[in-house]
Each structure stands twice: as C-alpha cells, then as structure tokens.
Amino acid sequence: IDITTNGSFLPYSAKKIVIHRSIISVIAITINTLPDKYNETIKITKVANNVEELLAVTDLLLHYHIVVDVGTNFDRNNLSELLPIYHYFFDKGYFSKWNFHWNIGRVDDRLFDTGYDEYIVSETDILLQLMKIPKPVPSNLHAGFIQTCKNLTDKLNLSFNESPIKGTYHYCWNVSPYDRVFYIDNELNLFRCTVTVGRPQYILGNLKDIDLMNYQHETKSFLDYKHCQICHIGGFCSGGCKLSADIDFVKQCEMEKKEFEKFMEAILIPQVREKLNRND
C-alpha cells in the first residue's frame, strides 16, 4: 500500500502505521518549511500541518524501516529554505538511509485559476539554489520540477536525479508515452495528471469500464503545435504544459520563452563559459 498525505493526521496514525508496516510500501508526505518559518509560511499558503510533529514522525517511521518520501514544493515564500532543509536532512543522516527520499517540486498554476502568480518562482530559481548543494548530490535527492529546461540540464549534469520520466520532445511525464500512471478518486474515476484530479472535465473514464492494461493515454509534444515549430527557441520547451496551452496558448508560450531565456542567461551561458574556461 502506498500512502500519500499532507501529514496533518499522520501523528495520530503513526502507531497503526508502525504495527502494519509490513504491508506499506511508502508514505509520501509534504514538508515545505522548517519549524522556525512555519507560522510565517502558513499565513500566505493557508496550508497547516504541524512541521515539528511531522519531522518527529518522519524520524520514527525511518527508524522502523518504513520508506518515507518527503516532498517539498517551493515558491517565493520558502525558496530561501531549500538549503536549510537540505542541511537539516543531511545532519540527521537521512541521505545515508535507504528508506528516505526527498523530492523537490515547484508551485505552479497550470490552469491559471489560483491567483498565486506573484508567489511562483521559475525552474531556474530553484536550480540556482540546488547548485549550491555540496557535491556529490545525494542519490535520494530528486528534482521533480524540471520541464522547460530538462533537455539542457541533462547535458549539463544538472537534473538532480529528476524522478519523473519524460520524452525528449514531451513537456512532462503526463504527455509522454512511458509511465502508465493514473489517479483514482473515491468514485473510481480515472485521471492522468495530478492537476486534473477532482475536476470532472478531465475524467478519462471509470475503472469499472476501462481496461487499463490496454488503455492508451494521450501524448503531446512540441511537434503537435505549428507555432512551436517556427519558434525562436526551437522547441526546447517541448511545447509547454498541455493543460495551460488548452486554456491560453499565447500566455503559456510567453511563460515558457521567459523561463527558457532566464535559464540561458543565469545557468547555461555561465556553465558553458566555465567548461570552456573562458570569461568573455
């Protein structure tokens, strides 16, 4: 059994989880800040889960050899916390534990309906923080947010063990032909992308009626968009998010161009200069 939770009720269930740990494959929780920044963060995010209790439960679960997958989603409120969180996990010895994983995500607004724009940071902003982590980067630290820049971060060895698998010309795992992953709600409705879960217009069908073994999910690449094929960034963004493109293609296109150009200026050009040992 895989358990995914924001962790609010985890402290109350810890005893049962430990007792039944033999049937639990992983517990995925979210920790977006350390205790000293907790009160400041929830004023804006409105997401309350007691970080001190979550950290204590994480320690307990790891002790009993339960696989714990900690996710941290970064935005403007907590980006400065990336290195402190890393050092906290490092000092606790978590990166040397086989049953610990840290997955790093990015807060976004794929459907342009959250009104959260001013708090969203770019892929490049997070990458610049990750690049400050001492090498070698732990193998159980996983980026889960690199999409626009992934084809280039792979070549620069800056993908930080990116966990989702995406095709070369595909924006993310959701529109790639590889991972056959689906989300199921309490009515057995199927969804493909985490952003779409709970939204009726994105239901793929019902588990009672669909043969998942033979179901072919929709794929999408920049080759499906005529505008991408003449774009000056040459399709490197892989066409952007399909959900965003369906709502406002021009807006998401401008966002992807801005992301790509920021990556070029802040990371790619300095990295190439460093590798060529040139300063001009």
Q: Where do the PLM segments sit?
A:
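Radical SAM/AdoMet-radical enzyme domain recognition
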Residues: 1-107
